[in-house]
Amino acid sequence: FVAHGAPREILTDAHPHIGSNLLPNVVKAIRESILKAGGEIHFNARVEHLLRSADGRRVRGVACADGREFEANAVLLATGHSARDVYRMLLADGLVLEQKPFAVGVRIEHPQAFVDARQYHLNPGQKRPDQLPAARYSVTATIRDRGVHSFCMCPGGFIVPAATENDEVVVNGMSLARRDSPFANSGFVVSVHPEDTESFRRKHGVLAGVAYQKALETAACRAGGGMQKAPAQKVPDFLKGRVSSSLLPTSYHPGIVPHPLHELLPAEIVWRMREGMRMFDHKWRGFAGESAQLIGCETRTSSPVRIPRDERTLEHPGLEGLYPCGEGAGYAGGIVSAALDGRRCAEALAEQMQA
């Protein structure tokens, strides 16, 4: 990242951050390096089918929606956790997939000044010194065998829309390089295990977790009323099971509308979220107070599907030369872990090519 224009501070910071405003130029520079090294990048080339050898045992490339085919001795499948069409494609091609745990919930938003005051032990009315960065936090608990935790906390950040289809509302968080928004936000999520999606399994099989996510996302879209407006609720109202009569200012630009999130989310998610919020508020007075607001839904924390691979070769056990990789394959949970898994898969592929 640094070699392609990211701030050098990320090499030593405990919580490295590039900034969503700087990232496009970094990615552009990475793309240009790939091209200079002899690589090719094909935009608008959606893969619809895997090409196989005559005996069907080995991949020999990919076929795209526009009719183009790219032949290769190996395919590294690193499509991210929101490319749901890839899962359906693999199933149609007869490949085995597995369910895995994931997490769903909401974004919780506080004034950044509130987080600063707690983390830096400031006196009432005292502002954070300019020399200190916007403060961050992490909270976690286990409630009846399920994790309840913050996720992807964004100090001085924004809540942003992250849907991939028109009938969804999905929220995520981001921060610019300076982290100077007056808001702090974080995912606040509960673990979902395969057995929690049983009601979707009869119709959707191994994609039951995907269907579970999709049901929440379309419900959030209906609750928001369209145009990517999101359902929201003050935390005290969520805890008491009532609709908020008014909402707080927010960093979410498309807008928010009052809605009972305790009715939108599954009951087993709601009561664990409530228990977690009360627990964290006991340790950190105000965490679940009048300045805290929930915006839904946060559903894309990780993939609900794992694409199996051999522990040694990292190839899919049902198709030689296919290397499932990263978050979409279920082997990573963030930027750095996905990058490390990509490197691991590239090394395994290189070893096979040199054998």
Residue ranges: model-predicted function:
Residues 1-355:
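Residues forming the flavin
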